[in-house]
Amino acid sequence: MNLLKGRSAEEKDSIAASIQRALVDTLDVPEDDRWQLFSEYDAEDFRHTSGYLGMAYTDQLLIIEMTFLEGRSDELKKSLLAAINRNLVAAGVVGGDDVFVMITEIVRANLSFGKGLAQRALTS
């Protein structure tokens, strides 16, 4: 999650929980399968347009980058995007326009959870 510096620990907890809930509910990700990083930026390093495609962005903008193993359908990804937005808005940490999400998919051989193994390439 990329965001402007200044969010409280409680706000970051709400952001993390909202995204995790969407992953669990939409993609059946296990509750304890959590890999989340926050990158906070000073104002001079967090630059974005004020609006695009009908959105009006504020300094509360969250730029969320997600990396998945390839294979999930477009429908599942669209459902996830909607769930993330809905959960963050319901948590009161951001307005609906300020949720910018990018999903990148990688092949199974491009991920190691440790020990120098591509664990997901060993199974299908």
Predicted regions and their residues:
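A domain-level signal for the structural core that forms small-molecule/cofactor-binding pockets
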Residues: 1-124
